[in-house]
Amino acid sequence: MPPFAPLHVWRRRWLIRLAFYTFVVLVAVPLAFSQVLLRGAAQPPSAPPPGYVAGSVLSQGLRLRTWTRRGSDARPAVVIVHGLGDSLESYVDRADVFARRGHTVLLLDLRAHGASEGGYTTLGGHEREDVQAAMEALRGEGRAGAGLVLMGHSMGAVAVLRAAVGQPAVRAVVVEAPYDNYRANVFHHAWLLYRLPRWVPIIPITIAIAEWRAGFRADDVDAVRASASFGAPLLAIADGADMRMPEAVVRRVADAHAGPHQVWVAPGAEHVGAILHPDYWRVVLSFLDASGC
């Protein structure tokens, strides 16, 4: 028996190894990373606080949880949408402020979050339909006669911006920490969290796998394009210490807007933390007053 394997045996071994490593880099790792993009945050339902009524809306065959507090039909109804990994419970404090102003308020659990159905999140892709389902529910109940105000945070900000397009009933939109578009957001977070540069092929392959698994088009999820496609007044809030959706990204979304818009930067605020700033409600409510809401 020779001390070394023949050349053709070594060549075959190296080809097998190359095929294995290629599979890992181009298939297995992107498949695992796609789950990071698609992972929601389901949790058991809780009872609504006093004054709120638990309900649901149907979006693309998925049953989504809502909490609604009824107000005056003379005020625009408000839809409040959470961000990635969150649920409607976190936004009751915001809803209470609007309720005290007389607004009907609807809190929504997006798909694959909270107590809503769904296996995947699409970071504002299919979630547009979730927001529009909530809007339609308010219209169906006769609660949107004075129009609608949409408020979204992070992923929810992208969802409400996209949901506002082609909706004349939308009177004003408030967004905090939106990203500009799906691909740019994934590239940014790949570097921020994993130090993966843009040229690494894992990232576009991961996006393609996520598109295939969840049935959406990443290029459709574009908050800048959505902002340019409706004219209702827009308040864009940037969190001053936010590394995920920095001020420059928020301004890019706002500067593209087709109608009146303003940007407020909450100094020192972390991601979706502007509400902790003492000027938060002064800014938000002054904007709504100026918008006739």
Language model segments and positions:
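Alpha/beta-hydrolase active-site loop
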Residues: 121-142
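Conserved alpha/beta-hydrolase "acid-adjacent" motif
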Residues: 243-249
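Conserved alpha/beta-hydrolase
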Residues: 95-117
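Short beta-strand/loop motif that positions the catalytic acidic residue
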Residues: 229-231, 236-238
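Catalytic histidine-centered segment of alpha/beta-hydrolase-like enzymes
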Residues: 269-281
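Alpha/beta-hydrolase fold nucleophile elbow
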Residues: 142-154
